Design a protein with these regions (language model features):
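Conserved alpha-helix/loop element of class I SAM-dependent methyltransferases that forms part
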Residues: 1-10
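Short, flexible hinge/linker loops that cap or flank conserved catalytic cores
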Residues: 7, 25, 213-214
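S-adenosyl-L-methionine-dependent methyltransferase catalytic module, highlighting the catalytic core
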Residues: 74-85, 89, 93-226
């Protein structure tokens, strides 16, 4: 696919750095993957996302980007999000999913400024950094759904009709307890955790204790152009 073919789509849904996550894959219906190494023919287009996207202003309805922004520099993140604002129609939404290095398990990597597990993570994204970047942009409003702040895990209900995020407790298979043994084990550990604390435990406390079995937990935020 080339950009002329993208332009005739109505509506236009873009998945930035999307690899093979595009139409007709479940959760990515209507989405065109924009990637430096597109997976093949069909609903994908080649583009270096550090450069301007060759589409007119106010031409895109929905933009999605998961696990891409951490691979570019902070200045490049700002420039790309500003480019997305230009592209979005009034009423358009951009959904972002990035690693959240503010969680207790991965905070030591944020403190040292690098993550040797993932050397290709150029920017160690986190709630404080992403909020600062977003608040400097002209989006009319934003909503964080899934993030760590001051040692607390915030998890609001995510409407996936606005865009798929794979690496969340809802969708990542590592977070699922499918067998009876797993369910009993989780229930027993939860009970003992509550018992030892006199049952003065919130669901948020349980969520923090369990963790999400992910290498790095996700930060999810929507940006709105009203």
């Amino acid at each position: 696919m080339n950009w002329s073919e993208v332009l005739i789509k109505d509506p236009i849904y873009l998945n930035l750095g999307g690899s093979n996550n595009c139409h007709p894959k479940v959760g990515y219906e209507k989405y065109i993957s924009v990637d430096i190494n597109p997976p093949g023919e069909g609903w994908s287009v080649k583009q270096d996302l550090r450069k301007p996207i060759p589409l007119p202003d106010n031409s895109v309805t929905r933009i999605l980007s998961e696990d891409f922004l951490e691979h570019i520099k902070v200045e490049e993140i700002k420039a790309l999000l500003l480019e997305c604002f230009r592209l979005l129609k009034p009423g358009g939404i951009m959904r972002i999913g990035v690693p959240d290095y503010n969680n207790p398990k991965d905070y030591p990597y944020l403190k040292r400024g690098s993550d040797p597990r993932f050397p290709h993570h150029i920017t160690l994204t986190n709630y404080k950094l992403m909020r600062k970047i977003i608040e400097e942009l002209p989006f009319s409003r934003h909503e964080f759904y899934h993030y760590w702040d001051n040692g607390k895990f915030i998890c609001k209900k995510i409407d996936y009709s606005f865009g798929m995020i794979r690496r969340t407790p809802d969708n990542d298979p590592r977070c699922r307890t499918t067998s009876l043994k797993q369910k009993v084990d989780v229930a027993l550990k939860d009970f003992m955790y509550k018992l030892l604390r006199g049952f003065r435990v919130s669901e948020e406390d349980l969520s923090v204790r369990r963790g999400h079995r992910l290498h790095v937990t996700s930060l999810v935020v929507d940006l709105f152009k009203d």
